[in-house]
UniProtKB/Swiss-Prot annotation:
Residues 253-256 are annotated as: Adenosine 3',5'-bisphosphate. This is Decapping and exoribonuclease protein. InterPro entries: RAI1, RAI1-like_fam. The modification Phosphoserine is found at S394. The lineage of its organism: Eukaryota, Metazoa, Chordata, Craniata, Vertebrata. Keywords: Exonuclease, Hydrolase, Magnesium, Metal-binding, Nuclease, Nucleotide-binding, Nucleus, Phosphoprotein, RNA-binding.
Length: 397
């Protein structure tokens, strides 16, 4: 659900003073996997700080009203036989992807809870605030061969904020999205409708509208290396029967994929799709991904559960596989790179980190539109209520 960013191609803006402060020793960051193959870095077990919901009109609510509950078909019953094409396009209300939400929903949550954060407001001054999806892209970067990305970064009251910008290539691809791909996107949401109920112990109702404006989001705290993190991500459902009832350990991620019939197909699945599933679920501490495998007619014929902590075992002995240590080490390196690059505390100043497959991460500096993303209502309220804080948390925070 993490929002995409601006739509216009960047025009480099003259910002003399900030440009002079860019560190000259580290102008770019390389991304080759071999550079990040060291031991797995420290990653603090994610803890949930709170949640919020977005309704059918994409309006924010600081509660769990949009949370759904995992309700799979009986284990000993017949196969699932879910028709993922049912209701398309008549009962489909997709989110308007032209609307640039940036970090706005997460920032509203931060405003409402800034005085209740564990460790006090001083903790936030040393943290990085972003969406889980942005971190997922960083984790998979060393192995990504097709899609580049851009991340806008601003420092305000000590906190580093990261917000994705839609690249021109991604925008062109989205606007030219073929009908089959649009239908496949619908199928993923339809699968959730077959697997989730509105209350614990309830039954799914796949007859209703699929509205992708609706979302339940968890807000989490963690730390990667010496980088405190506050991030949010959409949660598909909560499992009332989970051994641990404390979020995020009771959350379940739902996915769909085409049926596999050969070892080669499974090998490709493990190398590519499972990497993204792992990154997306490992970051927030979601323990299981439940996948529905669909046939060419769009029916789910089988379900399979992938424990997040066991996904790497499928590629451990594959020379062309991925390594979690590489993913996390690169993410930590990027955070260090960003923290040392974005040194000026100014919500109107943006460092744009850009990456294309095969190249390094590069940086350009911009002021105000079109890249500035911290809204005035957030900046003004934080400035009035909390004076700029210089305290940086210790690595053990």
């Amino acid at each position: 659900m993490e929002p995409r960013g601006t739509k216009r191609k960047a025009e480099k803006t003259e910002v003399e003073k900030p440009l002079n402060k860019l560190p000259r020793a580290v102008p770019s960051l390389r991304t080759q996997p071999s550079l990040y193959s060291g031991p797995f870095p420290f990653y603090r077990r994610p803890s949930e700080l709170g949640c919020f919901s977005l309704d059918a009109q994409r309006q924010y609510h600081g509660d769990a009203r949009a949370l759904r509950y995992y309700s799979p078909p009986p284990i000993n019953g017949p196969g699932p036989d879910f028709d993922l094409r049912d209701g398309y396009p008549d009962r489909y209300q997709p989110r308007d992807e032209e609307v640039q939400e940036r970090l706005d929903h997460l920032l509203r949550w931060v405003l409402e809870h800034r005085n209740q954060l564990e460790g006090g407001p001083g903790w936030l001054a040393g943290a990085t605030v972003t969406w889980r999806g942005h971190l997922t892209k960083l984790l998979t970067t060393p192995y990504e061969r097709q899609e580049g990305w851009q991340l806008a970064a601003s420092r305000f009251q000590g906190t580093l904020y990261l917000s994705e910008v839609e690249t021109p290539a991604a925008r062109a691809q989205r606007l030219a999205r073929p009908p089959l791909l649009r239908e496949l996107m619908y199928m993923g949401y339809k699968f959730e409708q077959y697997m989730c109920a509105d209350k614990p112990g309830g039954s799914p109702d796949p007859s209703g509208e699929v509205n992708t404006n609706v979302a339940y989001c968890s807000v989490l705290r963690s730390r990667l290396g010496n980088h405190p993190l506050l991030f949010s991500g959409e949660v598909d459902c909560l499992n009332p029967q989970a051994p641990c009832t404390q979020p995020p350990s009771c959350y379940v991620e739902l996915k769909t994929s085409k049926e596999m019939h050969s070892p080669g197909q499974w090998r490709s699945f493990y190398r590519h799709k499972l990497l993204k599933w792992w990154a997306q679920s490992f970051l927030p501490g979601v323990p299981h991904v439940v996948a529905g495998f669909r046939n060419p007619e769009g029916f789910v014929c089988s379900l399979k559960t992938f424990p997040t902590m066991e996904m790497f075992e499928n590629v451990r002995n594959d020379r062309e596989g991925w390594n979690p240590s590489v993913c996390m080490n690169f993410c930590a390196a990027f955070l260090s790179f960003a923290q040392s690059t974005v040194v000026q505390d100014d919500p109107r100043l943006v460092h744009l980190f850009s990456w294309e497959p095969g190249g390094p991460v590069t940086v350009s500096v911009h002021r105000d539109a079109p890249y500035a993303f911290l809204p005035s209502w957030y900046v003004e309220t934080m400035t009035q209520d909390l004076p700029p804080l210089s305290k940086t948390p210790s690595p053990k925070d």
